[in-house]
A protein has these predicted regions:
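Short regulatory helix/loop adjacent to the ATP-binding pocket of P-loop NTPases
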Residues: 135-151, 167-168
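A cross-kingdom feature that marks ATP-driven nucleic-acid transaction machinery
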Residues: 2, 25, 33-34, 41, ...
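Walker A (P-loop) phosphate-binding loop of P-loop NTPases
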Residues: 29
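Short glycine-rich substrate-engagement loop in P-loop NTPases that contacts/grips substrate
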Residues: 55-85
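Pre-Walker A adenine-sensing motif
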Residues: 2-17
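Conserved Walker B catalytic segment
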Residues: 96-129
Length: 429
């Protein structure tokens, strides 16, 4: 089954032969390799590129394990570049496997992979593409190391607009399946629910947890897994390392220090398993700092961690909306609006929350996620923070109800969930 990922394919095509290293990042199994080795490869072949001019090195494949040594990797690639008059395309998959633990842990130790990439950049007839599942040692470091000669494309799991047409279900069934099993592309190929659950559980234990534990040399694998479950149980809730540490300590089962929790959160974020949304003071126009919110990059992995037992559609919908906004390229923060209220005859400060402050260039939207709006009281509750925002940017409530887009007397736009998810320009209705 071929799933079209036209958004990302168009990005790759637009960056072809631009003299930069294309760094394709994203969580493991989100479709980076498929995009590069299938969709983009097929595009190049159809455009007249000869097969021998596409040099593919999947470093997570046992057949290529020797090329995790940067010296051997360099020698192998150079041996394939035999004609200076031909244009070559180099695909290096899961490049973090060519970075040693010592190189990661010790900033004074040069990362040899970067030397290999630098050498390839000097060749006029070579176009380089690198995929990886770690932001620190690929996107951030490469973009810094090559000073404007790196070009990142971040890949997410399937958006609902990609998942729904490929699922063969009506949109309501597809939505429930998407919330439950997530958007990793292979989930659509699993024949039944039992297979889907087994696949996700296997990914968590054999890939995500193991990868992070091994890559960061974590001694307490059980503690890392427990932390992932704590975050999974609290999506959409404000949290920080201290709160999570207190949760561990109060349970009496395990104690993990706050600095260790902070490191674990950083590792999970760098590996794209979770994403962090910071608090932003809308009136004060400044970031507040902790606590923040954490969302899972894929809901299926989140649900598998919790043995598919915590299915709170309100929180899952909020997480899915966050993921969709990130997929569309927005920067997403948690908004805070401070107001003054009367309490027992005295003025007091109160903070109201806006689920998402959404920015892209000069555009900004304020968005609330509301599972249902059954009555006017609920509408007023959801819009309470929005109507206190003293600017003219668009205020939106996204709800699971199925009805036309409309604007109420307070100037708040109400958008049905499917209208939002299935139309790229839905925020501008």
């Amino acid at each position: 089954m071929e799933i079209k990922r036209d958004k990302y394919l168009k990005k790759l095509i637009s960056k072809r032969n631009n003299g930069l290293i294309k760094v394709i990042t994203g969580i493991r199994r989100c479709g980076k390799s498929y995009l590069l080795f299938n969709l983009y490869y097929d595009y190049l072949i159809k455009d007249g590129v000869a097969e021998e001019c596409i040099i593919s090195v999947p470093l997570d494949d046992d057949d290529y394990i020797e090329y995790c040594d940067p010296q051997k990797l360099s020698e192998y690639i150079k041996s394939k570049i035999t004609d200076s008059n031909k244009q070559y395309y180099v695909f290096i998959d899961e490049a973090q496997y060519a970075i040693t633990k010592e190189e990661m842990k010790n900033p004074d130790v040069p990362i040899r992979l970067y030397g290999v990439l630098n050498g390839l950049l000097r060749k006029k007839n070579v176009d380089v593409y690198v995929t990886g599942s770690n932001s620190k040692f690929l996107s951030s470091d490469i973009l810094t190391e090559f000073r404007g000669r790196g070009d990142e494309i971040h890949i997410a799991p399937l958006a609902f607009s990609e998942y729904y047409p490929a699922s063969g279900k009506d949109k309501y069934e597809a939505w429930q399946a998407y919330l439950f099993y997530g958007g990793l592309p292979h989930i659509l190929a699993e024949p039944d629910n039992e297979s889907k659950e087994a696949y996700l559980e296997r990914l968590n234990s054999e890939i995500y947890i193991r990868d992070i534990v091994e890559r960061y040399d974590i001694r307490d694998a059980a503690g890392m897994e427990t932390l992932m479950k704590v975050i999974a149980s609290a999506i959409g809730s404000l949290s920080n390392a201290q709160k999570i540490s207190d949760t561990f300590n109060s349970s009496g089962d395990k104690s993990i220090s706050m600095p260790t929790i902070s490191n674990y959160l950083k590792y999970l974020t760098e590996s794209f398993v979770i994403q962090k949304s910071e608090r932003y003071d809308i009136k004060g126009r400044k970031y507040i700092g902790t606590p923040s919110k954490y969302y899972y990059t894929d809901l299926g992995l989140r649900n598998a961690l919790l043995n598919f037992r915590q299915f709170e559609e309100t929180h899952l919908m909020e997480n899915a909306i966050y993921n969709e906004l990130i997929y569309r390229g927005y920067k997403v923060d948690v908004g805070v609006v401070e107001i003054r209220v009367d309490e027992n005859g005295k003025k007091a400060r109160k903070q109201l929350e806006v689920d998402f402050v959404v920015n892209q260039g000069s555009k900004r939207y304020y968005i609330q996620s509301a599972y249902a709006l059954p009555n006017q009281e609920k509408v007023e509750q959801e819009q309470a923070s929005l109507i206190k925002i003293p600017d003219s940017f668009k205020k939106i409530i996204i709800t699971s109800g199925n009805f036309p887009v409309w604007r109420n007397d307070q100037g708040i736009t109400i958008i049905g969930l499917f209208d939002f998810l299935l139309n790229d320009d839905s925020l501008d209705y």
